[in-house]
Amino acid sequence: MSTEYSADSSKSFMIAMQSMIDTSQTFNLDRSKISLPDFDDELKKVQKDEQNQRTELTVLSQDRNDWDDIFEEFKDISFAQLQSIIDSYKTKNAVAVYKKIGKLINEAETTLSSNVLLETVLQMVYKHQKQELEKELLDFLGTGNIDLVSLLLQHRRMIVATPIETTILLIKNAVNSTPEFLTQQDIRNQVLKSAEDAKNRKLNPATKIIKYPHVFRKYEAGSTTAMAFAGQKFTLPVGTTRMSYNTHEEIIIPAADQASNKNYLYTKLLKISDLDHFCKTVFPYETLNQIQSLVYPVAYKTNENMLICAPTGAGKTDIALLTIINTIKQFSVVNGENEIDIQYDDFKVIYVAPLKALAAEIVDKFSKKLAPFNIQVRELTGDMQLTKAEILATQVIVTTPEKWDVVTRKANGDNDLVSKVKLLIIDEVHLLHEDRGSVIETLVARTLRQVESSQSMIRIIGLSATLPNFMDVADFLGVNRQIGMFYFDQSFRPKPLEQQLLGCRGKAGSRQSKENIDKVAYDKLSEMIQRGYQVMVFVHSRKETVKSARNFIKLAESNHEVDLFAPDPIEKDKYSRSLVKNRDKDMKEIFQFGFGIHHAGMARSDRNLTEKMFKDGAIKVLCCTATLAWGVNLPADCVIIKGTQVYDSKKGGFIDLGISDVIQIFGRGGRPGFGSANGTGILCTSNDRLDHYVSLITQQHPIESRFGSKLVDNLNAEISLGSVTNVDEAIEWLGYTYMFVRMRKNPFTYGIDWEEIANDPQLYERRRKMIVVAARRLHALQMIVFDEVSMHFIAKDLGRVSSDFYLLNESVEIFNQMCDPRATEADVLSMISMSSEFDGIKFREEESKELKRLSDESVECQIGSQLDTPQGKANVLLQAYISQTRIFDSALSSDSNYVAQNSVRICRALFLIGVNRRWGKFSNVMLNICKSIEKRLWAFDHPLCQFDLPENIIRRIRDTKPSMEHLLELEADELGELVHNKKAGSRLYKILSRFPKINIEAEIFPITTNVMRIHIALGPDFVWDSRIHGDAQFFWVFVEESDKSQILHFEKFILNRRQLNNQHEMDFMIPLSDPLPPQVVVKVVSDTWIGCESTHAISFQHLIRPFNETLQTKLLKLRPLPTSALQNPLIESIYPFKYFNPMQTMTFYTLYNTNENAFVGSPTGSGKTIVAELAIWHAFKTFPGKKIVYIAPMKALVRERVDDWRKKITPVTGDKVVELTGDSLPDPKDVHDATIVITTPEKFDGISRNWQTRKFVQDVSLIIMDEIHLLASDRGPILEMIVSRMNYISSQTKQPVRLLGMSTAVSNAYDMAGWLGVKDHGLYNFPSSVRPVPLKMYIDGFPDNLAFCPLMKTMNKPVFMAIKQHSPDKPALIFVASRRQTRLTALDLIHLCGMEDNPRRFLNIDDEEELQYYLSQVTDDTLKLSLQFGIGLHHAGLVQKDRSISHQLFQKNKIQILIATSTLAWGVNLPAHLVIIKGTQFFDAKIEGYRDMDLTDILQMMGRAGRPAYDTTGTAIVYTKESKKMFYKHFLNVGFPVESSLHKVLDDHLGAEITSGSITNKQEALDFLSWTFLFRRAHHNPTYYGIEDDTSTAGVSEHLSSLIDSTLENLRESQCVLLHGDDIVATPFLSISSYYYISHLTIRQLLKQIHDHATFQEVLRWLSLAVEYNELPVRGGEIIMNEEMSQQSRYSVESTFTDEFELPMWDPHVKTFLLLQAHLSRVDLPIADYIQDTVSVLDQSLRILQAYIDVASELGYFHTVLTMIKMMQCIKQGYWYEDDPVSVLPGLQLRRIKDYTFSEQGFIEMTPQQKKKKLLTLEEIGRFGYKKLLNVFDQLTFGMTESEDTKKRFVSVCQRLPVLEGMKFEEQENNEVLTFYSKHLSSKHNNGFEVYCDKFPKIQKELWFLIGHKGDELLMIKRCQPKQMNKEVIIHCDLFIPEEIRGEELQFSLINDALGLRYDMVHKLIS
């Protein structure tokens, strides 16, 4: 019999009560109307009055009672709980027990409130068994509350008989009751009394219910369709029936009535045709549905965050698509109607799907929909990894919550990816209440904080099924309730769904229960099939699909209903043929009965076939798993969930099917466009879980947070990420979580009483306590450092690793206890199996035999636990997984996969923990275990087993066990014989060639007695196969002690295909112990390949530790010397101070009163410039008229000195100061007149090489070398040669040359002094403490495993915090490694400023107009933005004006922060209170990787800390990798020993001396070497220079002699010297190399390629290949730009660099080639860095071309010389050879000379007159007068309006063109000399002889080539320069005439090297 709410229903009483609550509007309580279930009158009244259930809640007036207040204690009680109350009160003595418990709780000695204590204690009672409970209660309550503990233990069974919420209420009520036994009437009276008491209380005024515009529901309140949005519980929907049968109980919830939903019926559907082009393209149907139409205005036309709660199947995915299209639209430019230009690289969309299967479906759907826009959609899950390139190329990434958490929580995070996210879509957001909900909370909180900190827009969209408390979720997602919160009830479902919930009798899991479920499921299945429906039956294991199908067929046969399920004969026949070849017997068999199966274990083809058959109606019943519901869009008329017990391997047992799965499965019932009018969803469960699913489906429970249980791990993740650095930030972070929202709404659930929330509404103190407790836990586990004084957090390696690999803190605790550096494989496997991740792996009796079998068959390592423990079971399963043993039990197989999946992650974490702790053996074991799990192969197995080889071959290899070394030596035939299979030989040979192998070469360089530098070169030796090796291979490089116990150094090495043929170099420092170990071992191990390991032992047998004799000059307590000690009032007037500082006082006598050489080592900022000036004053006094040379290592330093001394010295003494650098080429007369020459090492080296012909070099009396410690750098050899050469010059000229070396403190000062010829009283080596402003130094370490960019990103927040701590209102200087980093650092600091109360805290400009004035002057956009926040930028990529503005504002303290590259430390004297060195590495193009900065650079940067006269102390903070901390700590304090690097580049320097005649034989070369620093250090540190065998004086000399031999051989190979025994003769090519300061290797490569008739393209290639361009930087990301430039260039890289010249796109010579072409084509360069790079390329190009012209002339290649001269003209003017030379003039556009039919070579060699035709030439224009030139300008510009300034400039340039009157020759001196001269026609030519080269970055002087030739034979060439004679400008030169050509008639050409001017004439020589 079926009636609505029958009296025998267990729910009837509460339903009755609920109805009365809903209908009581005035609450005038009548005792007769409140009754218990045995009062039939009231029940009948309820049954008749259905309208009462639909009555809306009215707003109560102030004088009426509020039911919520009256029944405060009962408001959250469900039906079952109230029934439990009644049952409990019927129990004898229950009240007395509860009363006593309540009394003892109130009297308990504890700091907790009674409410919290009661709940906490009861949770223990419910959670633990009696044995555990006693210990837990005593630990918690203590012995002082022993009575309470005893009472709880005694009555535990009674207490847990009722739900915990009921027990809490019973105890509270019992405290005030007296009777020990209550009748039913007593209970009723007590309820009424509570109501009466509540009635008399003063009530708060009722609040008005707010109506929200987008909440669409049938009822406002009173039913579940109206939703319990405030977290209340309501009854079932109207029309619900409940029926009871013998086998089951059934509740049917009718489908929603769409007819009464006005919003659904009358919503105007938006037509797709009315929408824009984007929507028309994506949506192929005519209209949007109701929900989509209502959501469209907000989803598509705003950027509001949104929450869309709607039934499954209502079209939420397309709503998500609308928001995606909106995002795409924002990054698109529409050109015309259908042309759309999308900025693909500027945005990312993240779609977070709950399951991988759903992610795959979304990817498939979105890919098709967005294909017209070329939008890439890819899956990023545990199964589908993406490479960095794929991530960059993808716009829409579909991922899972856990995967996106992993991506965003890593500090090495794909920061570019995260920063580009503009839309985050979270599907199934109702998962918040499940275990995975905490992950969603973490993601949203992290995203919201990122939005706030970065001030960037990330839109968040939440998609959900209907939620009970959706407003809370909306608040959590940051949704505006009035705009973005959408709720649609079940009536909006396109196909209404009838839900049938069946509770089958019998104990859950019992046989009876299973049989009842099978029977009931069949009955429902049969019923639906009879209606003509197709049905999906969902089961919960793959095996169960077939089992259920067979069971249904069996029941159908027994009921004679087989024909009911029979498939349609036509469809059956159609698919029978397809199934004939199918191997799945089960599938074929059950198909005959109209059944199908579908699960993830089937082949994809079989799954696709099943789906197609179901769609076509060939099968009526499909038995499937839940993956079908999530992953495939395959609807059915009816879905049946058969059973709700799902095996969870994480918990090691069966759990309830999640509500999200139920909703998703039900969502497949009755999809639009398929089958019946309504859908049907049937759930078959056990009777005890029926109420649970009823409450879930009808949303009777609000969604609560699960975040609290994961707080410790999530806090660690945020600390490791760097987003939370202190307690306050952590409290703020918690405020973004859903837990915070619910804690305030429902505090009792979270252990918070109402009193606490009343006193602290924002729960600040509660959150603080939670954070502090969690932080203490992390601190105790050594995962973070928690300073409880400052409340700051510091991440540690263990915490970072735990965060990156998702380790639980409980597991970390276990590992801390069990990790052992000597652990074996068995120990490690036992430890892994004890992880808390495997606590849920429970032992079940039925699997004992299977486990025993697995233990016997597959366990290779001893198991430390019993098989019946979680640890023992996990261990066996893991070893079985590695051994690839088959597991038959499905639950055990699931457990095995779970264990293996998690073990990989845990092992990787443990490996990194071992590496970070420097445990060699442990790390090796862990890496082997990692690879074993990943490859499913034991580490001791043969490496070839990793390849896909036949079983018999594998078996043979395992039997013979040949080593890989042996196999690699065999040929294919021999390999075939080895495995007894000749055919397999070639395959094995191919496989072996692809097995990764790395060759290692190592060199050692002792630095000090305790530190050694190791240089290793790694050479890959295998064939790359993308199918095997993918895009990259990962290796670990370890340096271990000989016993492998201790790791001395480690690095991760990434090898990609393009680098396969390169040698990879690494440099690192290791400590040396005492006594010295016999050897260290360099080991390179593959990260993935088993057995792939290379080792190289470095023996210390012949190692000699260096002898670094030094001294530290102690600062004597002298009275400061007054400036009057100079005894020269003129000089004294220069100085603004009265006294020298202590360091200057100590050095004064030696420098000012003697002519002794001196070395002064002192920290930066200690006043060394004054020391140099003291030496200068002495030189002025002692050697008047002599020159002083000041050598600074950088042009910026030179400029600083020039500016300073020109202001300081020249006006006072009259002595001129001249700059001599590559940028400044002064007139020779200026150099001659100057007293002080300030230059760079390279420039002075080039000049002094020809000292015999340069008098000013011979006149030098003092050389000051600043920063001489740079000897150790690449430029150090130049300084060595200068010193050696000047000493040599001094010995030759007998004129003394004083040397002054200035440096920071060095640790081998005696060697430095000895080399400089310094005596004891001239040696000063002061410690860092002599600084006028004392320096505080901090060195902070960061994770070693981070790549460069993520590492820099990680440092930004610590930089910001350091500025706030150390320099909150004083200047701070931040040094970074690259120009790009200045920009990225500035942007991050701006984001962090945005989170401050005062975002402009670093800006000290109050006047907005003043700020705008500065901003208007700035060109760079980033600088313009950053200046508004008080942050300046300074690097070479900025234009000079931008740099000057930054410099000026920082100097004036208008801005507080300046971010600069390291060059600023050298070039600009700009001190600050705080200096932060952000990273100690920079990118080096030579090694295509990052290398450490020189210590000298770091010291120089640190030297900028502390402002004299402003600061009492300065602060310097160095951020580096953790492994480098000790290195910098040692050497930054002690000083670094300086070594020579001359031996690496001796070739060119020795060549220069050979050219000058200083060296004519090998003995002289050796003698010259004895003057060098190299000679001295080779004796004191022989091992560093490769001297191992014989380290005696004779042995060192022999080594240096062999060094000279090899150097001379190199020069000979370059055709630069001729060797005759010991004599050395320089060739002209060596003279050319030395004169133009280019490498002999450049000459060598040119001589290999040069020929006559070279093309323009060939010359351009030769120029690009010059060795001088080796160091042109190629930065990350420039390869793509180079490829694009190559495609757009005249000469592509592919067509130019062919055969032996083939070069990759990342080669600096290729970049040079492309930049030169871009310069000639005058095209815009893609990035600012390329502009500066082009300047560098052009700077070198002319010097190299001059050398090339001389080489070609020497070889007599006439045509090649002409081409090279043309190349020089083109480079200077920035045009191509066929462009009109006239068109380079001001105001004209480049134009080609048309209508020529000559070849390229012919065109280059044509004279201007030949080219002329109808065009004017430069020579003609140069002869015109002023008016004519104005007419010519109008003619050339076609009358287009140009500014007057441009016209004037055109005229001015034309009037100064170096047009000549002609060529004249005279012969003299016995006809041996031919004199040529000509003169300028223009009298307006400037005296500087500058020529117009507008596109060249430096000023160019007039220069002519005079070429004499006969036909194609080049006979003579001479460079001619103009000079002023009287009022005329004359070009004059003398040519030597060889005897053999006298009397010949020669053709002479005079060609300008910059302009298209050429003069030709024929002259016959006199015989």
From Swiss-Prot:
Molecular function (GO) terms listed?
ATP binding; ATP hydrolysis activity; helicase activity; mRNA binding; RNA helicase activity
Sorted keywords for this record are:
Antiviral defense, ATP-binding, Cytoplasm, Helicase, Hydrolase, Nucleotide-binding, Repeat
Q: Where does ATP bind?
A: 310-317, 1162-1169
The record's catalysed reaction(s) read: ATP + H2O = ADP + phosphate + H(+)
- One Pfam family from the UniProt entry? Sec63
Supply the CDD domains for this chain.
Answer: DEXHc_ASCC3_1 (cd18020), DEXHc_ASCC3_2 (cd18022), SF2_C_Ski2 (cd18795)
Span of the annotated motif DEAH box: 1266-1269
Q: Which GO terms describe its cellular component?
A: cytoplasm; cytoplasmic stress granule; cytosolic ribosome
Question: Deletion: any effect?
Answer: Defective activation of the ribosome quality control (RQC) pathway. Mildly defective ribosome stalling induced by RNA arrest sequences. Sensitive to anisomycin (stalls ribosomes in the rotated state).
Q: What class of enzyme is it?
A: hydrolase
Q: Does the entry feature the keyword Cytoplasm, yes or no?
A: yes
| Domain Helicase ATP-binding per the UniProt entry, residue ranges | 297-485, 1149-1324
Asked whether the UniProt record includes Ion transport among its keywords, one would answer: no
Q: Which residues form a coiled coil?
A: none
- Domain Helicase C-terminal, which positions? 516-735, 1355-1550
EC code = 3.6.4.13
Task: Give the intrachain disulfide bonds.
Answer: none
Mind listing the GO biological process terms from this record?
cytoplasmic translation; defense response to virus; regulation of translation; rescue of stalled ribosome; ribosome disassembly; ribosome-associated ubiquitin-dependent protein catabolic process
- Where does this polypeptide localize? Cytoplasm, Cytosol
Query: Tell me, what does this protein do in biology?
Result: Involved in activation of the ribosome quality control (RQC) pathway, a pathway that degrades nascent peptide chains during problematic translation. Drives the splitting of stalled ribosomes that are polyubiquitinated in a HEL2-dependent manner, as part of the ribosome quality control trigger (RQT) complex. Also represses the translation of non-poly(A) mRNAs together with SKI2. May block translation by inhibiting translation initiation factor 5B (FUN12) action on mRNAs lacking a 3' poly(A) structure.
Extract the PANTHER family matched here: ACTIVATING SIGNAL COINTEGRATOR 1 COMPLEX SUBUNIT 3 (PTHR47961:SF13), DNA POLYMERASE THETA, PUTATIVE (AFU_ORTHOLOGUE AFUA_1G05260)-RELATED (PTHR47961)
* Family designation: Belongs to the helicase family. SKI2 subfamily.
Q: Name the chain's protein.
A: RQC trigger complex helicase SLH1
From which organism does this entry originate? Saccharomyces cerevisiae (strain ATCC 204508 / S288c) (Baker's yeast)
Taxonomy-wise, where does this protein's organism fall, top ranks first?
Eukaryota, Fungi, Dikarya, Ascomycota, Saccharomycotina
Supply the gene name. SLH1
